[in-house]
């Protein structure tokens, strides 16, 4: 079963900021490859919403590590959908970095 995904405003802003930072620092190929990886990871969530692990800070919130990239995707599994809350660099602490809903 494919689960619908909704990107929260902050997650979209995170994704855009990461893209533009990588574009300026490493070029369009790196920026595009990283964004494509985010999309492929979310596609995994569509098929398996529990693929990530619990964040420990809240019962419903989970995180999915992006392999070979220094990022995690923080999300919530709802009854009929998945909400992407944040896309964070692994050097940042998770607690307090996303909206609690």
Protein language model features and the residues they cover:
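Enriched for short, Lys/Arg-rich terminal
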Residues: 70-72, 76-101
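Catalytic cores of transferase enzymes with a strong primary signal for eukaryotic protein kinases
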Residues: 14-19, 51, 61, 91, ...
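Arg/Lys-rich, positively charged N-terminal/basic patches that mediate binding to nucleic acids
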Residues: 1-35
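Short, hydrophobic secondary-structure boundary micro-motifs
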Residues: 31, 53-55, 96
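Basic/aromatic recognition patch in beta-strand/loop cores that engages polyanionic ligands
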Residues: 39, 47-81
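Short amphipathic alpha-helical/adjacent loop interface patches that line ligand
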Residues: 15, 35-38, 42, 68
């Amino acid at each position: 079963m494919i689960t619908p995904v909704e990107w929260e405003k902050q997650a979209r802003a995170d994704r855009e900021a990461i893209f533009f930072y990588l574009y300026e620092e490493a070029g369009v190929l790196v920026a595009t490859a990283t964004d494509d990886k985010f999309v492929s990871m979310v596609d995994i969530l569509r098929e398996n919403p529990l693929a990530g692990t619990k964040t420990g800070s809240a019962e419903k919130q989970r995180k999915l590590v992006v392999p070979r990239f220094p990022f995690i995707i923080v999300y919530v599994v709802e009854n009929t959908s998945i909400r992407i809350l944040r896309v964070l660099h692994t050097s940042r602490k998770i607690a307090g970095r996303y909206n609690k809903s």
